[in-house]
């Protein structure tokens, strides 16, 4: 069977559904798929296809996730939905499914519930930039005042976590009724799609961001100088550009005097490409794996940060026993392990395998980092946790 050609002409945006268990996330995902396919063309996915989420492994962590695609007239969306709460936690922390925006589903029959709050907090910690609210099951609430009350509660909760609760779009609808084809509720799904189009800005492409390449290997080529190799994470580097070597040691500046890929010389290296970069006047011993090459001033080295961490369960190959404060594992950033110590939140004595927890990490040497950077926690080369930098402290 021929694969459909990937449509690149429209901007591509990644979204997903979040919210409390049984509030209708998967039903809404199916409703969006159906209503948009019916209105704008495309393939409709059934509830059962989405609910039966395939198992994926991201950094050794088992996550069940459903990916569907749909189109509006102006955009192409990739949408992720998870069956269980634990899957959301893992997904958001590992960045397995990066979201440019999230649809928070709240059943108007219940209002905000504990996981509603937890998903909003996680969105804040892992850097989901925009949230749109879909109040579901509105067909089951006769009282307009009650709907208003729930909307107010949700807006206040979002404001509590520094999302613009007063200004973000809230759509009142019924995913099930829309899925059953009732026109007044289908219209609400189109309203939601229009909100996605207008409220979530087009994401900046990796290639338009400032240049950054994690250094994987260093060679010296006699008569030419030092070459560092790696995969360009973002941006473009051109021959003649000034670059910085950041992390582990004192930051130094140098110039890119050559870019090569598959033994061919190029004028530039772009996001996603594996290349070798020749550095002017840099000695082989001045650079090491674990540092990054970047556009000057675009990223700084840090040692202390607040993070959101998921600790692998025993079944996932993680630890069999809890850990306590003073735990000193390795933190794996991009290409290297750095030892660090942890500080647990007040009142938390120990962390069990399978938990997710906020912790402050202090590394023994600085690493180039931005908020939103993912890392793994390892003991002797074995992954025991996954985390994301939520806030840089020092």
From Swiss-Prot:
Keyword Magnesium applies: yes
Region feature (G2): 60-64
Chain residues that bind Mg(2+): 26
Annotated localization: Cytoplasm
Region G5: start-end pairs: 174-176
Entry GO CC: cytoplasm
Function in brief: GTP hydrolase that promotes the GTP-dependent binding of aminoacyl-tRNA to the A-site of ribosomes during protein biosynthesis.
Name of protein: Elongation factor Tu 2
Biological source species: Shewanella oneidensis (strain ATCC 700550 / JCM 31522 / CIP 106686 / LMG 19005 / NCIMB 14063 / MR-1)
Classification lineage: Bacteria, Pseudomonadati, Pseudomonadota, Gammaproteobacteria, Alteromonadales
């Amino acid at each position: 069977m021929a694969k459909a050609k990937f449509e690149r002409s429209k901007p591509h945006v990644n979204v997903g559904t979040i919210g409390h268990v049984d509030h209708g996330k998967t039903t809404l995902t199916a409703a969006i798929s159906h209503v948009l396919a019916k209105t704008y063309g495309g393939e409709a996915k059934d509830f059962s296809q989405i609910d039966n989420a395939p198992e994926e492994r991201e950094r050794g962590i088992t996550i069940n996730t459903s990916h569907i695609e749909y189109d509006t007239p102006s955009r192409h969306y990739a949408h992720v939905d998870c069956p269980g709460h634990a899957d959301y936690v893992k997904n958001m922390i590992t960045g397995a499914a990066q979201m440019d925006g999230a649809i928070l589903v709240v059943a108007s029959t219940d209002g905000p519930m504990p996981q509603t709050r937890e998903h909003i907090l996680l969105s804040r910690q892992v850097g989901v930039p925009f949230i749109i609210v879909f109040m579901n099951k509105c067909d089951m609430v006769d009282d307009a005042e009650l709907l208003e009350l729930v909307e107010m509660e949700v807006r206040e909760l979002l404001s509590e976590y520094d999302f613009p609760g007063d200004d973000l779009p809230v759509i009142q609808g019924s995913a099930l009724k829309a899925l059953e084809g009732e026109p007044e509720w289908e219209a609400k799904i189109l309203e939601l799609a229009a909100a996605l189009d207008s409220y979530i800005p087009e994401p900046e492409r990796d290639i338009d961001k400032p240049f950054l390449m994690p250094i994987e290997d260093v060679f010296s080529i006699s008569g030419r100088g030092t070459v560092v190799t790696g995969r360009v994470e973002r941006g473009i580097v051109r021959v003649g550009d000034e670059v910085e070597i950041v992390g582990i040691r004192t930051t130094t500046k140098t110039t890119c005097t050559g870019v090569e890929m598959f033994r061919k010389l190029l004028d530039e290296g772009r996001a996603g490409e594996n290349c070798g970069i020749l550095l002017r006047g840099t000695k082989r011993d001045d650079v090491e794996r674990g540092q990054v090459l970047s556009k000057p001033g675009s990223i700084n080295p840090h040692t202390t940060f607040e993070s959101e961490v998921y600790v692998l369960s025993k079944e996932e190959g993680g630890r069999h026993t809890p850990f306590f404060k003073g735990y000193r594992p390795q933190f794996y950033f991009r290409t290297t392990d750095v030892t660090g110590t942890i500080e647990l939140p007040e009142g938390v004595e120990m962390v069990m395998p399978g938990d997710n927890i906020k912790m402050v990490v202090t590394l023994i040497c600085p690493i180039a980092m931005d908020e939103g950077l993912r890392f793994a926690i390892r003991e002797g080369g074995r992954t025991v946790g996954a985390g994301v930098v939520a806030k840089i402290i020092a």
